[in-house]
């Protein structure tokens, strides 16, 4: 007659342990101190500083086929369903274990608000070969092993879900940061477009006025155009390409009108000069005729 006992960790302080215990054999529970007490799935030694070297004992009673546990003067105590079995450094009376009980060895050690050393916390499952406890449904060893395999798969799936959830949160944070960056870039682009439109409207009246200048104000327009070409607006990064093209067109028109003005001035000057030359030719016969009349009248007197 034997029993299979399984300890499933509740706080990741150890790996699942499963061992077969025989009647009238005492199994020691304690802290890992040497090679002989190295933790394994088939013993009850743990790599935890909150356990004593000899912390507790566990055995199967051959008469009742019940599993019992007791504390053997541990410093941090043994707890069954959150009930301490004995005071510090004092042995306890045997305590019967049932499937589903929660067993804690030691207590959590804190440094301010942080856990420095974890207690060993486990849920107990017990199956006796050929018999079952009245507190649990009957199940064979094969079904117990199958259930344990299913539990391990569930734990693995849960850990995987936690990792996926963390990755999803990280991805959502990344998307939010990218969205903020795009919004900032869009706002900057809109602001630049508004500035370009503002400066284009501001400069258009001046450029339009230069497109068809009059001869009377040609020199004044030339001076204003020179000042405008050297103003900060001409080198402003907000002036659009269309505005620059319009300015070039106005400049070309201005040069054309200047050429026309100079041509007209040259023609006028040429006509004045021709008149000055010809007026003497026009007036000479007139004076000759007048002189002839005067002489003729004097002769007949």
Curated annotation (Swiss-Prot):
Residues 187-236 are annotated as: Disordered. InterPro entries: Cent_Immune-Sig_Mod (IPR051176), FHA_dom (IPR000253), SMAD_FHA_dom_sf (IPR008984). It comes from the Eukaryota. Pfam families: FHA. Its main location: nucleus. It is found in: Nucleus. Residues 27-85 form the FHA domain. GO terms for biological process: asymmetric protein localization to old mitotic spindle pole body; negative regulation of septation initiation signaling. The modification Phosphoserine is found at residues 204, 231. SMART domains: FHA (SM00240). CDD domains: FHA_SLMAP. Gene3D superfamilies: 2.60.200.20. GO terms for cellular component: cell division site; cell tip; cytosol; FAR/SIN/STRIPAK complex; mitotic spindle pole body; nucleus. Residues 216-226 have a biased composition (Basic and acidic residues). One of its GO terms (molecular function) is spindle pole body anchor activity. Keywords: Nucleus, Phosphoprotein. Interacts with sad1. PANTHER family: CENTROSOMAL PROTEIN OF 170 KDA, LD47843P. This is Uncharacterized protein C3H7.13. It comes from Schizosaccharomyces pombe (strain 972 / ATCC 24843) (Fission yeast).
């Amino acid at each position: 007659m034997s029993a299979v006992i399984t300890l499933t960790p509740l706080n990741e302080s150890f790996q699942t342990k499963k061992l077969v215990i025989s009647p009238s054999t005492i199994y020691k529970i304690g802290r890992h101190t040497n090679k002989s007490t190295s933790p394994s799935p088939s013993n009850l030694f743990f790599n935890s500083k909150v356990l004593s070297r000899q912390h507790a004992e566990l055995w199967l009673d051959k008469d009742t086929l019940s599993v019992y546990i007791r504390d053997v003067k541990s410093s941090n105590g043994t707890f069954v369903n959150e009930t301490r079995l004995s005071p510090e450094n004092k042995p306890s009376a045997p305590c019967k274990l049932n499937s589903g009980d929660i067993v804690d060895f030691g207590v959590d050690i804190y440094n301010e608000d942080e856990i420095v050393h974890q207690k060993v916390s486990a849920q107990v499952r017990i199956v006796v070969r050929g018999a079952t406890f009245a507190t649990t449904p009957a199940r064979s060893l094969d079904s117990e092993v199958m259930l344990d395999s299913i539990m391990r798969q569930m734990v693995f799936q849960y850990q995987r879900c936690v990792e996926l959830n963390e990755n999803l949160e990280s991805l959502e944070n990344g998307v939010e940061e990218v969205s903020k960056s795009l919004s900032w870039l869009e706002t900057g682009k809109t602001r630049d477009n508004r500035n370009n439109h503002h400066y284009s409207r501001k400069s258009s009246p001046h450029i339009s006025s230069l497109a068809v200048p009059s001869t009377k104000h040609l020199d004044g327009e030339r001076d204003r155009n020179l000042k405008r070409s050297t103003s900060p607006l001409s080198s402003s990064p907000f002036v659009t390409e269309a505005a620059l093209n319009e300015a070039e067109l106005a400049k070309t028109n201005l040069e054309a009108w200047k050429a026309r003005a100079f041509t007209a001035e040259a023609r006028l000057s040429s006509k004045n000069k021709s008149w000055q030359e010809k007026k003497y030719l026009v007036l000479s016969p007139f004076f000759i005729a007048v002189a002839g009349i005067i002489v003729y009248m004097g002769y007949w007197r």
